[in-house]
Amino acid sequence: MAGPRRLNEPRPVAVRAAGDGTPRAVASVAVEAVREEWLVEDRWWTPRPLRRHYFELALADGRALTVFRDAGDGRWFRQRA
């Protein structure tokens, strides 16, 4: 039996972004609106600090989705769907 699963575990996602980094499409679904965006910086005192740029999005298919870009390696993840 597997152990407990973490809720809202970040999962990799394909994002097409504008030149300024704002998401334009997520998994080939157009972004209708960016509802909110924020920057999280944590663990700055460690050898591997955490820096993420979050976006709360409204997608063309009606879904609301939160994604972030990891500033360390540039990869995109979905946090909540």
Language-model segments: which ranges?
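Non-catalytic peripheral regions of nucleotide-handling enzymes
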Residues: 1-81
